[in-house]
Each structure stands twice: as C-alpha cells, then as structure tokens.
C-alpha cells in the first residue's frame, strides 16, 4: 500500500525543484525515453527510505550543480508510481536487479552507468555525487566516451567497501 501522497510530496519536490521531470505512468516513461533516444537521460528511482533522503537526493542535487548535465533528467517514485517504476525497470533496465533508490545514466537509449542502492547505503552525498559527476563527465559530451569510462561506482576506496553500511557495522 503506497504511503499517503501528502507524506511523499516533499520527497518528490526535492527532485522536481531541480527541473527533474516526474514520470507517473508507462506512457510518461515511453514519452521521456522517446524524446531522449539520441541523447543522454538521467533516471532516478526515488524512495522514502533514509538512504534516499540522506544520500541519493542530495547527491543528485550536488551533481547537477557541478555539471555537466544530461540532456534529460527524469524520476519515478518506487512504491508510489508503481506502474511507471515497474515499466521502466522491465523495459529499460533488463537484467539489472531492482533497487531503490537507484540512478541510471542512459546514452542513446542504453544504460551506460548505474548506481544501485548498494552504492548509496552508508555513503555520504558528496561521495555519491562524485561518482555521478564522473559518469556525467564521461558520457554527457558530444564526444565518444573514453574506453575506460566507468559503468558503476568503484567502491574499492570507500571506507565501507565490501562491508556493511556504517549504520550496521556494530552488528557484524
């Protein structure tokens, strides 16, 4: 059962105030991806969880302020815009396990970079933003991306690499 609209509206606005378009139906998803077919598109799967509030949404804001920016930026809200979220996952993210929050950068209709929940949990917004900026710099240009362009964050230098998020480390 979805959370009350009044509860999630502020969470939606954290992204829409940045100029990110909400996709609330499969038709909205088709229209957005159709418009970005030969361009770049950043998809954010929003969520009510703490790592969305404390990590993902602030990281997106920081990354978009830093630039470069994608041609299009869109969001669906997991658990709220259920049909749109399921459709975007099934249609545009095949083989990628569902998670939220989640971010994917698309270039020419194909996902080229993903940030899954496991790349967000226990990390500071600045670190998540740096990962996203690296992807934007590699893929949001008129030039071909470098051969070593990343496809996911490299967590090997993260303090929590390979372990539990900091909030759960005391129980390991």
From Swiss-Prot:
Top-level taxonomic group: Bacteria
Alphabetized InterPro entries for the sequence: BrxB/BrxA
Region named Disordered: 141-172
Extent of Polar residues compositional bias: 154-172
Coiled-coil boundaries: none
GO biological process: cell redox homeostasis
Family the entry assigns: Belongs to the bacilliredoxin family.
Name the UniProt record assigns to this protein: Bacilliredoxin SRU_0242
Naturally occurring in which organism (per UniProt): Salinibacter ruber (strain DSM 13855 / M31)
């Amino acid at each position: 059962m979805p959370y009350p609209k009044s509860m999630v509206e502020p969470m939606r606005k954290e992204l829409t105030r940045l100029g990110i378009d909400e996709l609330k139906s499969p038709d909205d998803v088709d229209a957005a991806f159709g418009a970005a077919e030969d361009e770049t598109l950043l998809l954010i799967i929003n969520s009510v969880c703490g790592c969305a509030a404390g990590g993902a949404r602030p990281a997106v804001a920081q990354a978009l302020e830093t630039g470069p920016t994608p041609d299009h930026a869109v969001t669906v809200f997991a658990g709220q815009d259920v049909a749109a979220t399921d459709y975007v996952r099934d249609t545009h993210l095949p083989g990628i396990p569902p998670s939220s929050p989640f971010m994917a950068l698309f270039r020419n209709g194909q996902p080229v970079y993903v940030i899954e929940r496991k790349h967000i949990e226990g990390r500071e917004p600045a670190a998540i933003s740096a990962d996203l900026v690296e992807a934007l710099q590699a893929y949001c240009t008129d030039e071909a991306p470098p051969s070593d362009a990343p496809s996911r964050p490299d967590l090997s230098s993260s303090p929590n690499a390979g372990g539990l998020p900091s909030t759960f480390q005391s129980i390991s």
